Amino acid sequence: MTVMSLSRDLKDDFHSDTVLSILNEQRIRGILCDVTIIVEDTKFKAHSNVLAASSLYFKNIFWSHTICISSHVLELDDLKAEVFTEILNYIYSSTVVVKRQETVTDLAAAGKKLGISFLEDLTDRNFSNSPGPYVFCITEKGVVKEEKNEKRHEEPAITNGPRITNAFSIIETENSNNMFSPLDLRASFKKVSDSMRTASLCLERTDVCHEAEPVRTLAEHSYAVSSVAEAYRSQPVREHDGSSPGNTGKENCEALAAKPKTCRKPKTFSIPQDSDSATENIPPPPVSNLEVNQERSPQPAAVLTRSKSPNNEGDVHFSREDENQSSDVPGPPAAEVPPLVYNCSCCSKAFDSSTLLSAHMQLHKPTQEPLVCKYCNKQFTTLNRLDRHEQICMRSSHMPIPGGNQRFLENYPTIGQNGGSFTGPEPLLSENRIGEFSSTGSTLPDTDHMVKFVNGQMLYSCVVCKRSYVTLSSLRRHANVHSWRRTYPCHYCNKVFALAEYRTRHEIWHTGERRYQCIFCLETFMTYYILKNHQKSFHAIDHRLSISKKTANGGLKPSVYPYKLYRLLPMKCKRAPYKSYRNSSYENARENSQMNESAPGTYVVQNPHSSELPTLNFQDTVNTLTNSPAIPLETSACQDIPTSANVQNAEGTKWGEEALKMDLDNNFYSTEVSVSSTENAVSSDLRAGDVPVLSLSNSSENAASVISYSGSAPSVIVHSSQFSSVIMHSNAIAAMTSSNHRAFSDPAVSQSLKDDSKPEPDKVGRFASRPKSIKEKKKTTSHTRGEIPEESNYVADPGGSLSKTTNIAEETSKIETYIAKPALPGTSTNSNVAPLCQITVKIGNEAIVKRHILGSKLFYKRGRRPKYQMQEEPLPQGNDPEPSGDSPLGLCQSECMEMSEVFDDASDQDSTDKPWRPYYNYKPKKKSRQLKKMRKVNWRKEHGNRSPSHKCKYPAELDCAVGKAPQDKPFEEEETKEMPKLQCELCDGDKAVGAGNQGRPHRHLTSRPYACELCAKQFQSPSTLKMHMRCHTGEKPYQCKTCGRCFSVQGNLQKHERIHLGLKEFVCQYCNKAFTLNETLKIHERIHTGEKRYHCQFCFQRFLYLSTKRNHEQRHIREHNGKGYACFQCPKICKTAAALGMHQKKHLFKSPSQQEKIGDVCHENSNPLENQHFIGSEDNDQKDNIQTGVENVVL
């Protein structure tokens, strides 16, 4: 008997929709997607099995093994990104959204190509002329439903400040390690609403809440977004009125641009359904009602929460509908759960899942408002292009169009008001977002970075470009690249940069500086890339080795490049002052307003001139300061350095010698003033019966200009706002900084002082034209100390009486000299253009203007201290001859300086203004002193300690430099004198050589006690002899581990191993062909240069290669003798080359005396080729070549 078991099949009608919605969620988030499809410039993440099940084209591609998809990336060339977005939405949601008739044609063509039958049949349907969009979807019965919606009214745009424009995705989760962007912003933000995004991210997750920004916020950060403003306009938010619970429709809706907050609890999301459905009553969080002038957009009438409200501690991540929802609809019974039906509040459409409803709600959103320039009414597709265009367009004469984009003017209200250049807006936080955060009591959003832990180290990653940084401050500084913040303006043009190194790299093209120096040839270049190409072409340096030969800790392997291949020189050109970003009328208006706020009776010096450099004449600026009254100086006890910002601007175009005299008489100098410091007005109090007093204050912005060298008070490098700079030593201003009295100088006395201390124009030009040695500078300063006029020591007390004081700074000052900066090419003191690097050096009471152009010796020497202390003695200037700049002492001491003496501008000392490449200090190699000592010993033996014939040619310089030193010179003084040429005592070769052989190295400095027993050749060490014996014995101890080839010399083995490594480091500079050995490269370069160093011994023909030359010579021999090979050392002729080689070995074993006799015979009589018709072989060069060939055979 058979018993039949009763079975019942249970079918889940919503299973297919649920699976499809989950797959769509995975596609949107980029999780578990195994294929990336590239269409135009957009990347799409998808599942290969879903695509293969929906399209015959993808099925053939993925199932067939004939087409190999590299890295699971497939590129479609014949489709548009917008069309493929609609196709993916149809595959994952079974819905097609049609907005235009052209979209239907494109979808039909794409469906025919991809093998999607539903899309092919779209062309057979009839569409009305209504502009509203159509929706086609497949129901459960297989019937296609069609829906048309009315076009919504346009809503004004809402902007929240500047956008971060960078073509990188910022939605990637922490667990995903894929190289491609998991979210296609261009495809997703158009079709997926914000409610769907926030709901899908926290769907059925009660243990963790991921941080997810809405698509509206994410769309701001990508170039792929076709319209950023649509994301703002397309996110309506409802605000229900608590007093009227029934009105949950269109009247009480307001749009708020709010950002969801991070949380640690699951997020409750809203599911729209019919208004008759019962919902739970969820109290909303307190949100301030902000008035936003926007039109209201429809929302679903009622909601049903699928997850209970969390009662645990912690913040709750609410969606935007939940935050603003306040409905008092009674809840359903606890025992009965109604079926989930999702109805649209705008139409009678019903859906089975929230995903389908969210895709449907995209149809009810308003269309995109066109982006129009407010100046020229030109339309653009992206906001980024519009912003760039408006920056250019606003500088022209176009007036803003009344109907233009008011959004741009609301965020950037200062653009175009003052007529200045655009410096870039600051990142603004909109008022609605500030109110939201302030009302909820939370802090400002901090989502500009992510924190990762790698090997126990915390790294901060940028959310835009995924770069990692060790410190948060470095990440904040890097964030300026992605924002509109531009805080580093160029000193020469109107460009503003986000980072200081960008500005430094840009200013090189203005100054023409060559800061990158090659360590091989010491040649300098403007950029690192030019330097790299130079080293690749001329020095055969392959910079790719520094990438492939990295060690574990990030450095280079010592075997590849043990040193850095360049050094970055410091900046030598002084930066020009900032150009004013405001017009003169606006700046004067601000200064006048600050003048009215100051105390009455204030004397203010203004700048009526512009900040640009005018045309100057150095010779016509002598009588300016002498005709003007002296400006007294007021110092404060708490201020070390009194500065003046506007006095030099009031003097106008005068500079040069007047500024120097101002330093001499009043200890008055000026500083370089930035644009921000012009707002500070300089004021002073007026007292009855006194002249107007100018009070000068040292603000905190000028702290970077103070650089302490030595002494009690810091030395100050202050820079003029236009041209010259003044360097004052610390002790020279000690009396001025320690005094609390007001210094008043008589105009008559100051005028007489200027006439007495005025330097002659030719002397100033001579100082500026050539560098001065240290001896000359110290001689000048010692003379200056002896001739200080007494009138310069008169100062005035507050009562007005003059009193004579002693200058303490002159008695106790330590004289130092600072090296000036080199001028730009083409500038001089006699031209009409002021040199940018002119610096006044304050030494004692005399100012010396000096320009020192570096470049001849870039590795500076360090001067030695003399054994005897130099005693300075004042000498009369008239009797002291002017030392010549070509003297050996001057040339020797002019370059003896330390690198610490070369300083940059005060603006270069900014800690944020780092160079583009790191700075490395290279210590030059020390020269060997062995040869120098031997030459000194031999010279002393021959000539004694002092030779009467070698007298000092410049006695005045030596007396000034050494002072009252003892008669016997120290060892350092003798070292500077030029030593005579020594003659070799071992041979007579140097006595008989002519002028052409003076550069040849000498070979008899050391003895050679080790001689070879076979060839009698002498060597200096036994190791060299042992290596030489391998030529006779045939020993080859060095074997290649790769191919087994043996070598007698280890250097030949190392050259051979390069062949197996495949390293071709030597590149031809003409054809960029790479070679393994440097010798091979040199031989190859002869093809390009045409150098033929091998010439025939019998004729005047020259050859590139040695083998070609030997073959040519053998032809001469065969033509002369008819047959056989001739020996070059004797008249014997051999029949074969092997016999000639055996014969030549006999000459190797003869005694040296016999070889000399045979050599004399060969040179005089025994050469058969010379005795006959070969006239060309009689030259001395050809005989030397024959001897060279014999020596090569011997070796």
UniProtKB/Swiss-Prot annotation:
Biological-process GO terms, alphabetical: DNA damage response; negative regulation of DNA-templated transcription; positive regulation of transcription by RNA polymerase II; regulation of DNA replication; regulation of DNA-templated transcription
Superkingdom in the source lineage: Eukaryota
InterPro entries assigned: BTB/POZ_dom, SKP1/BTB/POZ_sf, Znf_C2H2_sf, Znf_C2H2_type
Sequence ranges of Basic and acidic residues compositional bias: 314-323, 753-765
Positions of post-translational Phosphoserine modification: 130, 309
SMART domains, A to Z: BTB (SM00225), ZnF_C2H2 (SM00355)
GO cellular component, one term: nucleoplasm
Record key words, sorted: Activator, Chromosome, DNA-binding, Isopeptide bond, Metal-binding, Nucleus, Phosphoprotein, Repeat, Repressor, Transcription, Transcription regulation, Ubl conjugation, Zinc, Zinc-finger
One term of GO molecular function: RNA polymerase II cis-regulatory region sequence-specific DNA binding
Domain BTB: 33-100
UniProt biased composition (Polar residues): 270-280
Database matches in Pfam families: BTB (PF00651), zf-C2H2 (PF00096)
Chief location bin: nucleus
Zinc finger (C2H2-type): 342-364, 371-395, 460-482, 488-510, 516-539, 1010-1032, 1038-1060, 1066-1088, 1094-1116, 1125-1147
Function of the protein: Transcriptional regulator with bimodal DNA-binding specificity. Binds with a higher affinity to methylated CpG dinucleotides in the consensus sequence 5'-CGCG-3' but can also bind to E-box elements (5'-CACGTG-3'). Can also bind specifically to a single methyl-CpG pair. Represses transcription in a methyl-CpG-dependent manner. Plays an important role in regulating DNA replication and common fragile sites (CFS) stability in a RBBP6- and MCM10-dependent manner; represses expression of MCM10 which plays an important role in DNA-replication. Acts as a transcriptional activator.
Assembly with partners or alone: Interacts with CBFA2T3. Interacts with ZBTB4. Interacts with RBBP6.
Record remark: domains: The BTB domain is not required for activation of transcription or self-association.
Protein name listed in UniProt: Zinc finger and BTB domain-containing protein 38
Name of the coding gene: ZBTB38
